[in-house]
């Protein structure tokens, strides 16, 4: 079994003090920021979206752990701006085109779970 990694969930992060929170995470050695991306279609909730992800990337170099709870992720992945250091989780039941989503992610070398 591999080495454990720390991935801090951003779902309940204080948006007003986000910059300070990110600084604490960086100082404490958090290795990933976990982002629950929800579209209100695959799951009934809405979660953190593309603009939030872009904002986080502007604040830190910490890679993202993207949990995609979205319908048909293979058509939406390009909006997210995935990087080689990110981890991406998709639900197999969120699409009829799982292989297309995997093929789209392959060039990024992302960890896929």
Model-derived segments and spans:
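Conserved N-terminal beta1-alpha1 strand-loop-helix module at the mouth
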Residues: 1-87, 93-97, 104-110
